[in-house]
Structures are given as C-alpha cells and as structure tokens.
C-alpha cells in the first residue's frame, strides 16, 4: 500500500511539471543572403563561416568583417528579418516560443555595429521582441527600425 501511494504521488508530480516544460520550444533562424566574410560562433564554441541557408540557433554570435553583411530570418509564429551591417556583432540571446500559448520571446544583443530589423506584428500579448545594447534595451511589438552601437571609449 505504501509503494502504491509513493508511485501515485510521483506520477502526479511528473504529470503536473512536464506540461509546463513541454510547451516552450527553441526557435531557429537561417541565413537568407550574405556578402563578404561573415562568421558564426556557435554555442559549442566553434566558429564557422556563414553560408546561405545555414541554420542559426539561440546562443549563436554572428560577426561581419570589413564590407560584409548578412540578412537572417528568425523563424517562429511571427517571422522577422535582421540585416547585419558591416563590422557588426550580433548575439541571438533568446529564441523561444510557446506553441500551446501562441507566444514567442526574442532577445538580440548587439555588441557593436548596425542592424536593421523588420519585426512582424506580435499577435500574442505575452510575445516579446527585445534588442539589447551595452547601454540600453528596446522592446517592440511590430515595426522596422535600426540599432547602431559605436565602440565605447
């Protein structure tokens, strides 16, 4: 009888906790276009040259050198594009979506350089799209805007 109670309690705890974790999924992005030398520092630590069609993931850092640029698409419930200008560095800090709820959470971190972002209108009230720089954070719900970060002295 005691084993049955322990088993039922464990099953109840598992049933109550798993659905909360199962709803959140990692989104991805991909390189749509590029010119010049664009590198991707992947979450595992390896830096590889970017290629058109290459998948991008949360934690990846894109860096453009010289006169290089890249256009990436962030996939999800609402798709957005980010154009990364020359001599820029962009971290894909957070790319999450809750498929059950229909919301998504995006955080981009611009260390240096300029990016042009086209954010699709966020339909769900809990959806977030934020861009962080060394001195500020901006959140939008659907617009087109540019962010430029110059070297701090």
Language-model region placement:
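Bacterial N-terminal signal peptides
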Residues: 7-17
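Flexible, surface-exposed loop/linker segments and immediately adjacent secondary-structure boundaries
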Residues: 22-153
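Sequence-pattern detector for short linear motifs
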Residues: 5-8, 144
